């Protein structure tokens, strides 16, 4: 039997504290540095490819951390190997600021998954040690930008499902020493992953 600690969701959030040094970027400068990103993520950060993430409107601090993690290899994305090697930290901060300043477009939702997805997102499944997603990502999926917790609302369901699966099998491991996302995702079955990803895609920031 899984024993649940008090304030479990709050503790999970605290474990996700962002470690990267971040001083903020300049969106105007960032716009001049994203040309090589446009093919996969769109000129305004709204990728039309469901397997590639939308970056528009994402929290600046979170974006910087992900860019830095990709650059150092802490987050492994085969298609991005070497693409960020010539950028310094200020360049990455500027790119993050540019995408954060853009407006996200709406995503496609598979209605058949919405009810289960809503239940998992809002309430989790405490019998299996799955907390709700709202503690860190908010009731409407807007995240917590100052703390570095990502906005999920409106993201492509396909991309979200792949990331949850990657966390569950350990292919993605840049969630900090607390292993919060890995611990949660490995408790979810494939239907729950697909459902919560579809529900999140339909949320509006």
Model features per residue range: what roles?
Residues 17-34, 48-51, 101-127:
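Electrostatic cytochrome c docking/interface patches
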Residues 25-27, 31-73:
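The feature marks the first
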Residues 48-54, 69-112, 146-151, 169-203:
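Axial heme c-ligation environment in periplasmic c-type cytochrome domains
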Residues 37-44, 95, 130-139, 196:
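The canonical Cys-X-X-Cys-His
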Residues 1-10:
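Bacterial N-terminal signal peptides that target proteins for export
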Residues 28-35, 56-60, 64, 122-134, ...:
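Sequence context surrounding c-type heme c attachment/ligation sites in exported
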Residues 9-19:
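Bacterial N-terminal signal peptides
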Residues 108-149, 157:
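Short, solvent-exposed interaction modules
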């Amino acid at each position: 039997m899984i024993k649940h600690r008090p304030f479990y969701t709050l503790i999970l959030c605290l474990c996700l504290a962002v470690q990267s040094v971040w001083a903020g970027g300049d969106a105007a400068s960032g716009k001049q540095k994203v040309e090589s990103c446009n093919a996969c993520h769109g000129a305004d950060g709204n990728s039309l490819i469901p397997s590639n993430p939308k970056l528009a409107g994402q929290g600046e601090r979170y974006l910087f951390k992900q860019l830095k993690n990709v650059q150092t290899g802490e987050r492994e994305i085969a298609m991005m190997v070497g693409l960020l090697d010539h950028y310094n930290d200020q360049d990455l901060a500027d790119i993050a600021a540019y995408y954060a300043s853009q407006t996200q477009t709406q995503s496609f939702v598979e209605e058949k998954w919405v009810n289960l997805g809503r239940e998992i997102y809002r309430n989790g499944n405490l019998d299996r040690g799955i907390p709700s997603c709202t503690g860190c990502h908010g009731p409407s999926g807007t995240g917590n930008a100052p703390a570095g917790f990502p906005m999920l609302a409106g993201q492509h369901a396909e991309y979200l499902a792949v990331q949850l699966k990657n966390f569950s099998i350990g292919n993605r491991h840049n969630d900090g020493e607390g292993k919060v996302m890995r611990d949660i995702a490995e408790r979810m079955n494939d239907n729950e992953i697909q459902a919560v990803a579809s529900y999140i895609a339909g949320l509006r920031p």
